[in-house]
Amino acid sequence: MLARRVVAALLLWLSCCVSALWRYYINSQDYSIFSTRSSIKLEYEGNSFVSWKIPESCKVENNTSPKTTLHCKRAGIHTIEPIARNQEVERHLTVDNSYICYLWYFTVVDVYYNLSQIVTIWVYDPESASTEELIRTAKKPSLIVTIWVYDPESASTEELIWTAKKPSLNSLVLTKQMNTLGQRPFIFTVEKRLAYHPGPLTSEGTWVIHLPMSTDDIAKVIQGNNVDFQDCRIADLHFLLTFPMEIVLEPPGYLPLTLPPGSPLMLSWDTCISTFALLATDQETFQTNDSFQTWTRVRAPPGILSDAQRHSLRDVLVFRTGILFLVETTVYLKTDNEFIKLDKSRGISETGILGLSKRRWCQIRYLYKSAAGRTFVLAWTKSEVYGGFGKFKFMRFTTTSRLKYLLKLPPTDTLEIITVEYSWHPLEAAALLSHCSVCTTTKNIRMVIFNSAYFSWKLQDFELQVPKEAKLEYRFLYSAMPDIIVWDEHQVYYGYRNFAVFGTITTASGETNLSSLSQGSNIHQVLTDSIGNVVVKMENNVMFYIKADITEAVILHTWVNTTAKTGLFFDKSFEVCILYYNENLDEKYQLQTQPYPLILELQSINKDLGDWCPYLAFQHNIHSQFYHMDKGESLTIWSQIVYPENRGLYIVLEHYGMRILTWTQNIEYEIASGFCTKTLITRFFQTTNYELVDNYYQLQKENTGLLVFQFRPSEFSRMCPTAKPVFEIDVGCDSSKHIMVQGFNRSGCQRRDFSYVIDKELLRESLSDNLVRNL
């Protein structure tokens, strides 16, 4: 019954905004198992459909139905096209003959008394699983596994909202069969590389794993043994798991807080937990902790904002401890127990605030190591930049008067702050500035980067000239070097490799105005991820794709109707999803989500573009974003590239930051069967000699700090699947190290006094007595 109601709601949603386009779906949200064993749902949206044009290697259940199921039993690239009175685009679907068919399903129970979490795991087959399992809301494990592939864009609403209550019988049988064959899952944590194993299979056909709650080891993977059943294995499941992210129910009588009428959707999510998100619309504001499977309204208490102010929301940022709203030009803070205006008592201007910005990249270990001394939010006016610290207290970082002095500009010139963003470097942020001597029709755009370790601003070799009325935004990409994407309403600009290369993104035809290729629509949203994907979404839902370090954009196949209200965000596996909003539906159906098969869509358009990756494989042993190196220590990194013979590729090491490390490199080369394998061994170390120096502490200060590195192939293209590994090396004393005292029971809270003694002969400074320290 639930499935029928949800599907009916989605159909009603689509009926309000019909135009000719077509999509495809599978039963799973994990496109890595898209294969010859998948049931591919085809859906044509519009009134001019006649039939489907299908290759002989595939079969369709009903060729004349706008909604039907496709099966392709032969691996390869299959061209699918609807025959309609209007000319429709064809797609080239890449169907693999994969042995990965089954999926893991899990539920989580939070145990607060010992800060642990119980994870119940079972295996399910998307093709034969229950409706509840498909919508990912089962509370008990499902043990049946059959081959099942699903397309997120065509998945049922039930699959997307996860409403299953118990495992299906098929999943129960499958899990027991896999267990008999030797399957035994475990949870692997990506950052700390820990493994948590279950007890024996329960009578309900589930494995139960106990693991601690964590804020610095949240990226996890469910993996299993290499066990085959009916020639199929289980796909690894990547997900995020941390302390429960609570959302607050609004008391009765609170009033809507919205964007101005006609505004496109605005999304904000937690830096590390993308499932904890907030959506602002011109009707309501919503908050979720499960990727909009469920949600609550976020409203303002009466008496604080006027009616006009409540409908003048300009920006919003969501954090675990509160939500920041920019209403007109004033910042308001909403927490569990208050809704207040921030002013000079919090270190920030009461009016004139133009925008808010937060960290875009999750750097868990570094954040955990020194979070107390770093900002987590930025705010700015035309002439001032503020940094926000713990408890939402701010400090002014700079003014345009100081920046004019830094840039050696005449006092009479006009210099304004456009926007401010954090870079990938954990200690840096950057301000985009507008400068003109005589402001006529254009303005010059410059950039300065702020380093919080030295409290310094540095002008970058980046300059653009844009129309005076242009409204600019930008993002730093996932890169050791400062790489950025800047955009206004119509164009996208780039600055790559520490601004050594910059310009305007073009299409294959040479067009730079994306609005002219999307019926005059403006740029709405730019989504970036950690593997170099950049998706540019227009207000009418036309989407363009840009790859990091590539200067050309390609238009993606139409997926969403031009009148639908949508936004892009990441699900719990950090895959791209589309969020739909329709205020005309029943309240519980107003928000719908669908995973978007970005990789399949890229493969489809590339069939005509002929853009292929120049290498076959690029591998490395970089398993963390953060490495610490103390005196006398070294770090060895292994990287390897495999490419066709005579291409002459190699691996490039790039770094950003203080030159306080030395490294040596050794290259191994091998040719076999027309392919070259080049392996690069890099060893990082320090050559500073601290023995018997008079300026020990000064020398130590000069040779400690943070460097950011990345390895990348010398050539790459839009279709290269692997990301360049980016990592930090922190050189110096590890502040997380402590003196450990053994031999005591941890269950008690009895305070004990300890002390230690260091022999005076071992100390650098001459002392008459041994050094005694109390703990």
From Swiss-Prot:
Glycans are attached at residues 62, 114. Belongs to the CATSPERD family. It holds the Pfam family CATSPERE_NTD2. Transmembrane segments: none annotated. InterPro entries: CATSPERD/E, CATSPERE_b-prop, CATSPERE_Ig-like, CATSPERE_NTD1, CATSPERE_NTD2. The keyword Signal applies. This is Cation channel sperm-associated protein subunit epsilon-like protein. GO terms for cellular component: CatSper complex. Keywords: Glycoprotein, Signal. Residues 1-20 form the signal peptide.
